[in-house]
């Protein structure tokens, strides 16, 4: 069975789109397990309180790292599979997957944790290639816009600032 000796697997997802869903954005808010219900409620493997604490500790490191110094980068690598995150965001940007961690809903990814290291994994690409239009009364139907979508800003500035896995 997956997860017994290979880490823990989560499928973070929001309960209500109208809520802030900081946990789905992988933002550290406090040490309370209840603050991360959208992660723990969607665990795909059995988890213990030790597993919950380890994940929250990793989120704290992720949220507190600014990425501005070499020390921040070293600390970040103690909590995040940095190479895996860079690969994930490269693909997300290339296929303009707005129904993902970088989209308005910030979901449709798996989160793997092993030994305190978080790895983001892709999931659900059915709305990739700029076909996502949730909340758009008149969806943008401009292929040229999406072909030229900027790879260095794959989401709005506000969304990017609220997603520490991308921002930091």
Where do the model's predicted regions map?
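Phosphate/dinucleotide-binding and metal-coordinating scaffold of catalytic cores
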Residues: 1-168
């Amino acid at each position: 069975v997956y997860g017994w000796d290979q880490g823990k697997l989560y499928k973070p997802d929001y309960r209500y789109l109208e809520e802030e869903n900081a946990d789905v954005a992988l933002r550290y808010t406090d040490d309370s397990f209840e603050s991360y219900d959208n992660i723990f409620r969607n665990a795909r493997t059995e988890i213990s309180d030790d597993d919950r604490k380890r994940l929250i500790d990793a989120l704290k490191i992720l949220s507190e790292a600014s990425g501005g110094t070499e020390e921040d980068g070293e600390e970040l690598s103690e909590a995040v599979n940095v190479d895996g995150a860079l690969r994930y965001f490269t693909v997300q940007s290339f296929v303009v997957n707005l129904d993902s961690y970088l989209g308005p809903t910030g979901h449709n990814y798996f989160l793997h944790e092993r030994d305190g290291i978080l790895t983001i994994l892709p999931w659900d690409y059915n709305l990739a290639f700029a076909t996502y239009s949730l909340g758009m009364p008149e969806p943008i139907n401009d292929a040229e816009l999406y072909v030229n979508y900027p790879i260095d800003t794959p989401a709005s500035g506000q969304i990017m600032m609220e997603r520490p896995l991308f921002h930091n």
